[in-house]
Amino acid sequence: MAEKRTLIAVIADEDTTTGLLLAGIGQITPETQEKNFFVYQEGKTTKEEITDKFNHFTEERDDIAILLINQHIAENIRARVDSFTNAFPAILEIPSKDHPYDPEKDSVLKRVRKLFGE
């Protein structure tokens, strides 16, 4: 199952997405013409759109190995992010230009702390 998961997907603001695309993670699947990124626009993107893309990348696509999501965007769908327990894709919360990273909010670090009894 993991051998066909080769892509990194992104749910992020425009600057973060642009930087990652320039670094080479952009991919459009030939069969379906689906992108592996979603650009969040402050004040325009709805919580439902974020949830739909998160579900699409985590449940419907079988070629995604890692999902990068800006932490401030993950906060909009925190319950959904925290409830995701599958091994693939790995969910990594990343900072953005305007929103610094807060380890107290990171769902992966919360699980690690819980595992070690902290």
UniProtKB/Swiss-Prot annotation:
User: Where does the record locate the signal sequence feature?
Assistant: none
GO function terms (MF aspect): proton-transporting ATPase activity, rotational mechanism
| InterPro entries assigned | ATPase_V1-cplx_f_g_su (IPR008218), ATPase_V1-cplx_fsu_euk (IPR005772), ATPase_V1_fsu_sf (IPR036906)
Q: How does it sit in the membrane?
A: Peripheral membrane protein
User: Entry's Pfam families?
Assistant: ATP-synt_F
Keyword flag Ion transport:
yes
Indicate where this protein is primarily found.
membrane
What are the entry keywords?
Hydrogen ion transport, Ion transport, Membrane, Transport, Vacuole
The record ties this protein, via Gene3D superfamilies, to: ATPase, V1 complex, subunit F
**Compartmental location:** Vacuole membrane
**What's an example GO BP annotation here?**
proton transmembrane transport
Q: Does the keyword Lipid metabolism apply?
A: no
Q: What does the UniProt record say this protein does?
A: Subunit of the V1 complex of vacuolar(H+)-ATPase (V-ATPase), a multisubunit enzyme composed of a peripheral complex (V1) that hydrolyzes ATP and a membrane integral complex (V0) that translocates protons. V-ATPase is responsible for acidifying and maintaining the pH of intracellular compartments.
Q: Which PANTHER family match?
A: V-TYPE PROTON ATPASE SUBUNIT F, VACUOLAR ATP SYNTHASE SUBUNIT F
Miscellaneous notes: Present with 4050 molecules/cell in log phase SD medium.
**Quaternary structure note:** V-ATPase is a heteromultimeric enzyme composed of a peripheral catalytic V1 complex (components A to H) attached to an integral membrane V0 proton pore complex (components: a, c, c', c'', d, e, f and VOA1).
The Swiss-Prot or TrEMBL record describes its family as follows: Belongs to the V-ATPase F subunit family.
Q: What is this protein called?
A: V-type proton ATPase subunit F
The organism encoding this protein is Saccharomyces cerevisiae (strain ATCC 204508 / S288c) (Baker's yeast)
